[in-house]
Amino acid sequence: MDKKQARLRRARKTRARIAELKMARLSVHRTNCHIYAQIIDETGSRVLAQASTLEAEVKKELANGGNAGAAALIGKRIAEKAKAAGVEKVAFDRSGFQYHGRIKALADAARENGLAF
């Protein structure tokens, strides 16, 4: 099993546990250059809010989308968009990524801006 397959296996297990909770989830994905966050409804069929370093407003503010500062900005934006969509509490889906660095920065920023998980 290679590194990617192991991450996807962890993600599958996490998503199965989150599905039992019957609540919206904050799904995070990262690449070397960008970070993406989505609020997905409890059925898993609809995206309620999304933010990424590919958005035009975000690109203007950042020199690099692949660092902890960019992740913190995305965490702040996703929390604001979630509140606008009426979502206050979510389950955090780190997609099998280690809770460290950019993933942790995004989660901390989202919590500071009023998203509960």
UniProtKB/Swiss-Prot annotation:
In the UniProt record, what gene is named as encoding this protein? Answer: rplR
Assigned keywords, A-Z: Ribonucleoprotein, Ribosomal protein, RNA-binding, rRNA-binding
Provide the GO biological process annotations.
Answer: translation
CDD domains membership: Ribosomal_L18_L5e
Q: Name a single GO cellular component.
A: cytosolic large ribosomal subunit
Q: Which HAMAP family match?
A: Ribosomal_uL18_B (MF_01337_B)
Query: Oxidoreductase: is it a keyword of this entry?
Result: no
SUPFAM superfamilies from the entry?
Answer: Translational machinery components (SSF53137)
Cite the Pfam families for this sequence.
Ribosomal_L18p
Q: Which GO terms describe its molecular function?
A: 5S rRNA binding; structural constituent of ribosome
- Is Kinase among the key words of this record? no
Task: Give the residues annotated as coiled coil.
Answer: none
The task this protein performs is described as: This is one of the proteins that bind and probably mediate the attachment of the 5S RNA into the large ribosomal subunit, where it forms part of the central protuberance.
Its subunit composition reads: Part of the 50S ribosomal subunit; part of the 5S rRNA/L5/L18/L25 subcomplex. Contacts the 5S and 23S rRNAs.
What name does the UniProt record give this protein? Large ribosomal subunit protein uL18
List membrane-spanning regions.
none
Q: What does the similarity note say? A: Belongs to the universal ribosomal protein uL18 family.
Q: What organism is recorded for this protein?
A: Laribacter hongkongensis (strain HLHK9)
